[in-house]
Amino acid sequence: MPKSFDIQVAAEDGDIVARVSGELDLAVRDEVVSTVSGALDGVRPDGRLVADLGAVTFCDSSGLGALLDLRRATSDAGIRMVLRDVPPQVARLLDLTDVDGWLPRE
């Protein structure tokens, strides 16, 4: 079975950009949190964690939980987190769960 998920993390202009593609669900939740959390040391004091979700094809409550876990980790580290290129299906989940204050969109 082909892998339906990928995450690439890179430093860009003092920010950490995590590009997520495929299905963001329970099967990949721990991988997302550990991969991105491990990169937070590379953020400048005025930098951000940018979660680029433009290639996400599916997100369930576990995927949302991973994003909220990352939000808590960035908050604890004094780093801002924003979501970029949020697909309509993910936007609907964010709207239904009323987490816009926790997960602002760019």
Region annotations inferred by a language model:
Residues 1-58, 69-106:
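STAS-like cytosolic regulatory interaction modules
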